Amino acid sequence: MTDAPVSRCGYVAIVGRPNVGKSTLLNHILGQKLAITSRKPQTTRHNMLGIKTEGEIQAVYVDTPGLHKHNDKALNRYMNRSASSALKDVDVVVFVVDRTRWTDEDQLVLEKVQHVKCPILLAVNKADRLEDKSELLPHLNWLAEQLPQAEIVPISALQGQNLDTLEKLVGERLPESEHFYPEDQITDRSSRFLAAELIREKIMRQLGAELPYQITVEIEEFKQDGPILHIHGLILVERDGQKKIIIGDKGERIKRIGQDARKDMETMFDSKVMLNLWVKVKGGWSDDERALRSLGYLD
């Protein structure tokens, strides 16, 4: 008589500096787009759960904002607190670093991770970009000295390379437990939240160097009416100049933002979407704790 498979479940914090590939990693593990991504640092502002259930293993990944050194605004302080809090009461930590580049912000994350008691996996991202893999060795050896308790896994979050190994190692380190979430649930976030994040992603991708970081998105209406899902999104900025940048010449930029966001929404929500966007100036919102609380950034 064979033993029944052991059910395992636990929380897995994905941590690292801004723009190192944490959200891309989560999306590839889940096999679908959940966390927004862009080339801009600090794209992720909230902790978000991504739930992967496969057989007896349920890994509850916590995608975190990148730890950074700027604490000048309430929003920055909130993001750093969110990232730090994710390291508490988790069962596994996946620390994502670049294959060669090491920054002061990587060091900041390292100093946090060195104190955790749970298993650590060091995911060395973008390893696929090196033709000669032996070039990785000096950096891997140095990383092993910094975190001797960690197991090092070279990966490519974008291409999905070696993620099966990473997931296997995560699963082996999760505690024996009943699953926390239904098998078909992939996140703890609401559809309204995901819609707002998709709009913010398109703003960040379209604006490039012009990007005003003092932007956020609030969903004012999210209503299914027959085959059409009606979504009204309010884009908040801090200055009139930022409003003009987002709207663009004759409204062309906000039109493109809406078109791109709508396409992703229709895929995510499996519905035809009617999306309307407005831009409003709300001066100083990113440094106003009352405003941040009303926008869902603070508890």
Curated annotation (Swiss-Prot):
Region called G2, residue ranges: 42-46
Name listed for the protein in its UniProt record: GTPase Era
Alphabetical list of InterPro entries matching this protein: G_ERA_dom (IPR030388), GTP-bd (IPR006073), GTPase_Era-like (IPR005662), KH_dom-like_a/b (IPR015946), KH_dom_type_2 (IPR004044), KH_sf_prok-type (IPR009019), P-loop_NTPase (IPR027417), Small_GTP-bd (IPR005225)
Region (G5): 155-157
Source organism of this protein record: Ectopseudomonas mendocina (strain ymp)
Region (G4): 125-128
Start and end residues of each stretch annotated as G3: 63-66
Region (G1): 16-23
Membrane topology: Peripheral membrane protein
Pfam families: KH_2, MMR_HSR1
Lineage: Bacteria, Pseudomonadati, Pseudomonadota, Gammaproteobacteria, Pseudomonadales
Residues that coordinate or bind GTP: 16-23, 63-67, 125-128
Quaternary assembly: Monomer.
Domain KH type-2, residue spans: 199-283
